[in-house]
């Protein structure tokens, strides 16, 4: 009976989706948005990127991250890069006017070029790195797919199964074979070496090796269930609507609602669903940005914000998978010699796609140590437990044993092992912290100690859930020491400072705002003073940068990077304004971000241009940096709206999960 009800509901969703597609086609013809940012689709197994200004897809990655594993020949490099199959994939002529948009705030991309329209999407229901392309009305318009591969085609052969005949392609320099399965009717093509021109619709599926071809064709045909390409598009949108949770916030505008829905999808796209294997342990990891953003690598810190956003939205399964990813990623503890000999589980920076710790991020080929990561991972675990009371996760078997024991022994203990006595309490040892300073410039950052305080607050409750009285007492004692040390080290003469060390760069620091939002600082005069000094970080684009940069050499990346407007700081400050009752100012800051996103496919970028340059070109206020941004973009926006609801309607109504899912479809 339940299956029958679900089936009828899906049929209804599909019929509605077909109407949405029809309406979108009409609207698309009359209301074409500016080209804007590149659009990305993904399904947790890979990514594809569409460039509206060129009318083509420009990337198809067979993995949901940028770097697969370390490069043994270059241990301090960013690693072995994920393959990309295509250079261009489209149907129009060079110079033709093109545009693209997401259909109904989904991951399905509809593009119009030269009077024809087509779809690109990676289906969540088919658990392989697969890209579906469908060109509408191709026989009537004469439009046909054209592809330029990103590497020389080495060989191709026919392969058949389940009544479908595909082509298996191999490329020079790419390990993964590419399987092509035709979906549309056969077209007569003369004088063309373009294989894709023979059909209006295709499935492009990356394989681990060619031996998978037959089984993947059968799997695909089972998933397809005989549906026409247009029906596959409609079903994908309908299934996505079933996955969504009911928002627990009151939107102030349609723009807010659309940005919430698109952000929800961005968070889903960003999470790896690749199964763990003997040499791969990245299932559940979340990248910091989506391509073409340069940060489509799993960062501990950004992932924490994305995880908490998913949890608070009601996406329990995705949040749980992210937490398990923290504890199953391996090998970790690579920098043990740099952290007082303490073994640890959570990476000190980020991860390769295979789940291995990557502590190398400064772009100069040297290592970083970011202790705040350990605090943020513990915060995410505590938030999840508070929302769902899922005690079973603490018993889950992970890389280093039961999850609770791994958290206690390989997060809390190494964190406290990397603290120093100060002012009768303790502070976290010098590191590179939230803004990823170069290791040679490490300092005692307020943010790292603040996140250690958050970690101990959370672990007090986690230990209580587990029934570990000794662990709870230790966490309480550590908490008291850290709070005392923080007050002595970072609040000096009534002013909150970003570092223990004196210096103009971090004297006022955008990271101080989330510290106050976390409730680490409660003195209203200190808060008022901090807000007043934030004027020193105001930039001409209208928002705030992270720090006052002290770089003097324009040849250095950070010289330009640190002079741009940083949206994570904007959203944090707007939240603080709202807490203090400055609601109109808070809403104005939020509305500005929402309006800018609405003009750019509801994509939230890392930054806005405040100082145009070659690295960050454009007009003042244009989106720049990594985009779409995930944890610091979609996640931060979602959390801001949830916090606004909490301030206006009470915590229980705002944060209680609604319509949660218990499995990841």
Feature map (PLM): residue ranges:
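Terminal accessory carbohydrate-recognition/targeting modules of carbohydrate-active enzymes
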Residues: 2-5, 12-16, 20-259, 294-297, ...
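C-terminal capping/lid segments that line or modulate ligand- or cofactor-binding pockets
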Residues: 37-82, 295, 350-373, 377-378, ...
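Helix-terminus loop motifs that line ligand-binding clefts
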Residues: 100-103, 277-288, 314-426, 592-630
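Conserved oxyanion/phosphate-binding beta-strand-loop segments in alpha/beta enzyme cores
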Residues: 248-290
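Extended ligand-binding clefts on enzyme/binding-domain cores
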Residues: 300, 331-359, 368, 443-454, ...
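Internal metal/ion-chelating core segments
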Residues: 417-465, 475
